Amino acid sequence: MRTRLSAATKPVDETQARVRRKEQTRQNLMQAALTLVGNGSSFTALGIREITREAGVVPTAFYRHFKTTDELGLALVEDGGITLRRLLREARQASLPGEDMIRHSVSVFVTYLKQHHLEWRFISSERSGGSQSLRNAIRNEIAHFTNEMASDLRLLNIFPGLST
């Protein structure tokens, strides 16, 4: 017996597939920029054609995801910051004694750096160079990270008197 998809189900499946493809293209563009930076290119010198060629998409596809290369860079900073802060927050909430929690957090951080070395190469080079908007975004991510860590350490009373 053959099951027929209702007319309402088919467009939903197609829409979901389109959303997945769009997200995959966005990720490919971001990874392409990181790969090019990892190969020695300066992010600020990267062109849209160069990024899209590396990503395997046509140049017009870039504009469906980002208005400028700066916007792409901001997405890289944001994604990296959100992921790292989440991982470190989970590490700090692992109910470990103070010093063990710090060691675990450092271990998580080092593992993340090793697994995401291209992101960190990008962030470290753009932190002092590149565009003002990227420098500001990186500075904000560092401030978020520092504030979250200081707040958790204060709550654990590991460093009494630590201001947050």
Where would I find each of the regions flagged by the language model?
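N-terminal intrinsically disordered/low-complexity leader segments
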Residues: 1-24, 157-163
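Alpha-helical DNA-contacting segments of helix-turn-helix folds
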Residues: 66, 70-83, 123, 137, ...
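Short, hydrophobic secondary-structure boundary micro-motifs
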Residues: 45-46, 121-125, 161-162
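Amphipathic alpha-helical packing segments from all-alpha helical-bundle domains
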Residues: 82, 132-159
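Hydrophobic alpha-helical connector segments
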Residues: 89-115
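Generic hydrophobic, amphipathic alpha-helix propensity
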Residues: 21-33, 51, 76-84
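Amphipathic alpha-helical segments used for helix-helix packing
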Residues: 114-132, 150
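Helix-turn-helix
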Residues: 28, 36-71, 75
